[in-house]
């Protein structure tokens, strides 16, 4: 069953394929956003995890940055994970960069340690199935801005 939504998944770097696969399994039409022309008629946006500095540079280099920022500022629904949160934040406490700046929060990059400290673990919930969890360096929200 199709949802009728066309969701753009930023696909210039990072963990975009997992988001795309899950959304497609739910019946959503997904578009990998790789160039400015891909942005035109999306109904929602996913900004995946990855490296926010690289994503920001690629968005500018591919001339996608301003078009995405305008759509977000005009109310485009966004799901942002990890690097996506950093791209949206209005302030980054441990970085001089600000990207879209459309979400009024202050975030801290790599707040949970270094990449080398990332790991996977398995847990069992309600004695029903094993669930693999991935723990990574990630940002956290330090403050909600005015």
Q: What spans do the regions from the language model cover?
A:
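Amide-donor transfer/coupling interface in amidating biosynthetic enzymes
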Residues: 1, 109-146
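N-terminal beta1-alpha1 cap of cysteine-dependent amidohydrolase-like domains
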Residues: 1-74
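Structural signal for conserved beta-strand scaffold positions within catalytic alpha/beta enzyme cores
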Residues: 9, 32, 80, 101-104, ...
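Flexible, glycine-rich phosphate/dinucleotide-binding loops
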Residues: 16, 39, 87, 94, ...
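Cysteine-nucleophile active-site neighborhood
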Residues: 51-123
């Amino acid at each position: 069953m199709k949802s009728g939504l066309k969701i753009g998944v930023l696909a210039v770097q990072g963990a975009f394929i997992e988001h795309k696969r899950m959304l497609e399994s739910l019946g959503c039409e997904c578009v990998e956003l790789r160039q400015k022309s891909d942005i035109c008629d999306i109904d929602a946006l996913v900004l995946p995890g990855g490296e926010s500095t690289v994503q920001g540079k690629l968005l500018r280099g591919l001339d996608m940055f301003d078009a995405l920022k305008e759509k977000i500022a005009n109310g485009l629904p966004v799901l942002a994970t990890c690097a996506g949160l950093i791209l949206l934040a209005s302030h980054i406490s441990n970085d001089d960069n600000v990207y879209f700046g459309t979400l009024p929060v202050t975030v801290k990059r790599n707040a949970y340690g270094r990449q080398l400290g990332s790991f996977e673990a398995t847990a069992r919930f309600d004695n029903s199935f094993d669930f693999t969890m991935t723990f990574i360096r990630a940002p956290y929200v330090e403050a909600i801005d005015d």
